[in-house]
């Protein structure tokens, strides 16, 4: 989750909570759910914060800190990011749960990594000033695990900022005033 105050909203569904840790913007609750170890953690907003969290969680289980080298046996973590999002579609209400089918990335974080797992990826030009944006399709098996009559399937957009990149204007003029309307 992004907001540290939302971690208890997730961990209250755990069978047990063994430990609670808070440092700066990170709130972590560690426990058990259905016999499995589970962790709820805040990441803060934005892909830059999520990048830090993903790297550091991976390092905790896959790096030998005495040598700073990868361990011989690599573990794979199952990470599910829960977050809040605005909607540009009027039929989607504030309290609805949306599962992301396609994720559109307007930032450039994805360009810094080589992924071994193959996802359905696309590059497309939305606006000339943005250059190419990256579109990734969600894993179909994972979507099927969570899809129900209580969820909607839709697309989400990751913007590299809260104001201009999402069409919000304060005092600075925007290069594209109607970016959200054009995306919808």
Feature locations, PLM:
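Metabolite-binding pocket within alpha/beta catalytic cores that recognizes anionic/polar moieties
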Residues: 1-134
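Active-site rim beta-loop-alpha module in soluble metabolic enzymes
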Residues: 121-184
């Amino acid at each position: 989750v992004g907001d540290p105050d939302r971690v208890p909203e997730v961990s209250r569904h755990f069978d047990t909570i063994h430990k609670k840790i808070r440092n700066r913007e990170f709130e972590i609750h560690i426990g058990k759910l259905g016999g499995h170890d589970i962790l709820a953690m805040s990441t803060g907003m934005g892909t830059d914060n999520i990048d830090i969290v993903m790297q550091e969680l991976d390092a905790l289980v896959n790096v030998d800190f005495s040598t700073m080298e990868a361990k011989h046996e690599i573990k794979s973590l199952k990470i599910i990011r829960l977050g809040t999002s605005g909607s540009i579609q009027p039929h989607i209400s504030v309290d609805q749960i949306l599962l992301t089918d396609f994720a559109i990335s307007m930032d450039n974080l994805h360009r810094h990594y080589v992924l071994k797992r193959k996802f359905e990826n696309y590059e497309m030009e939305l606006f000339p000033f943005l250059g190419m944006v990256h579109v990734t399709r969600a894993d179909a098996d994972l979507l099927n695990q969570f899809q129900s009559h209580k969820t909607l399937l839709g697309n989400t957009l990751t913007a590299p900022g809260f104001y201009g990149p999402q069409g919000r204007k304060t005092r600075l003029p925007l290069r594209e005033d109607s970016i959200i309307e054009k995306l919808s």
